[in-house]
A protein has these predicted regions:
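FAD-site-proximal beta/loop scaffold in flavoenzymes
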Residues: 7-8, 130, 136-152, 243-294, ...
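Short glycine-/acidic-enriched loop or helix-start segments at secondary-structure transitions
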Residues: 31, 54, 97, 129-131, ...
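FAD-binding core/adjacent interface of flavoenzyme oxidoreductases
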Residues: 2-17, 87-156, 240, 263, ...
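Beta1-alpha1 glycine-rich phosphate/pyrophosphate-binding loop at the start
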Residues: 17-71, 157, 162-189
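A conserved FAD-binding loop/helix module that cradles the flavin
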Residues: 32-33, 168-172, 283-326
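N-terminal glycine-rich dinucleotide-binding loop that anchors FAD/FMN and/or NAD(P) in oxidoreductases
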Residues: 37, 41, 47-49, 56-83, ...
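A Rossmann-like FAD-binding core segment of flavoenzymes
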Residues: 5, 74-107, 112-115, 178-265, ...
């Protein structure tokens, strides 16, 4: 992968940064950008696993609508390099207090760096339903977000595979982009009378029965196959993940507080992204599943500002008290 960002080929174990950003997606690069502009020595460690990688294009990002996720991140890496931020391909396997008010950060290749503060932006993984064709077509004609992809597939024949927790929700959402929507109840227990009325008002057709998989012909989705053998012709399928798995291993090992959400456990943060662990911030989809690229950028920016402010004021307080800088 080419990038103009200055990559560290081999970081010395005793090398210390003001901030290590763990994760190089939209939130991480945004935090790194403001930290670099704040003259903070910053390292971004990026495992290269963005949630939106399967998509050919991203949408709803002002001035970048239609840009590929890979090109967007490449542009971000070029920008952070202008401010001296270092970028490194790698995976952080752990972080622990270093006894100096900061953290020792270990990487999978055995190297280690020090950080006065951490910003964790490691995103999440969508665990998709185990149905034939879903994973293979994900991000192409199997989609989850109409705001991200609805315009590009408008007026086609939509199928929606119901999520057991909210069986009608996604079908109602996508009905604004097509008048030909079929909801497959799949494993959902059924519909409430209210949901059934809403679906009827939206013109959504409801099909009972468990989905077995998708029908793909000539590299094109053509239908949804039910377990009883029926095939319903469809051109696009919307489906939610069975489970959302945040990349929060480092945060959990540090003892960060978690909160329960309808989508599972996520790290608890304040409005700036500060976690319950002193010196550790988190931003982007690792903090919640509904952070689109534009939201992630804002959250990363906010975390970067908060980290810089804490370092600045902390250093001044130490200077006044005659303490060595942390």
């Amino acid at each position: 992968m080419s990038t103009n960002a200055r990559s560290t080929e081999m970081t010395k174990p005793d090398e210390r940064y003001d901030v290590v950003v763990i994760g190089g997606g939209a939130a991480g690069l945004s935090a790194a950008l403001i930290l670099g502009r704040s003259r903070r020595r910053t390292l971004v460690v990026d495992a290269g696993e963005p949630r939106n990688a399967p998509a050919a294009h991203m949408h709803g990002v002002l001035s970048r609508d239609g840009m590929s996720p890979a090109a967007y991140l490449e542009a971000g890496r070029r920008e952070i390099a202008e401010y001296g931020v270092e970028w490194r391909a790698g995976r952080v396997t752990g972080a622990a207090p270093d006894g100096r008010g900061g953290f020792a950060v270990t990487l999978a290749d055995g190297t280690a760096v020090g950080a006065r503060r951490l910003v964790v932006t490691t995103g999440l993984v969508d665990e998709l339903p185990k149905l034939d064709g879903v994973a293979e077509r994900w991000g192409r004609d199997v989609l989850h977000c109409p705001y991200c992809h609805g315009w590009e597939v408008r007026d086609r024949a939509f199928g929606v595979i119901a999520h057991p927790m909210m069986p009608a929700h996604q079908a109602l959402m996508v009905s604004n982009w097509s008048k030909d929507v079929t909801l497959f109840l799949h494993t959902a227990d059924g519909l409430s009378a209210h949901d059934a009325a809403l679906l009827d008002a939206a013109g959504v057709t409801v099909v009972a029965g468990e989905v077995a998989g998708l029908v793909v012909e000539d590299d094109r989705l053509t239908g949804v196959r039910l377990s009883d053998g029926r095939v319903v012709a469809r051109e696009v399928v919307f489906v939610g993940a069975d489970r959302l798995v945040p990349g929060d291993g480092v945060l959990r090992r540090l003892g960060a507080a978690l909160r329960e959400t309808p989508f599972g456990e996520f790290v608890t943060v304040d409005e700036t992204g500060r976690t319950s662990v002193p010196g550790v911030w988190a931003a982007g989809n690792v903090t919640g599943p509904q952070e689109q690229v534009v939201n992630a950028v804002g959250l990363g920016y906010r975390a970067g500002v908060a980290v810089n402010n804490e370092l600045l004021l902390g250093d001044l307080e130490d200077a006044v008290a005659g303490r060595p800088r942390g």
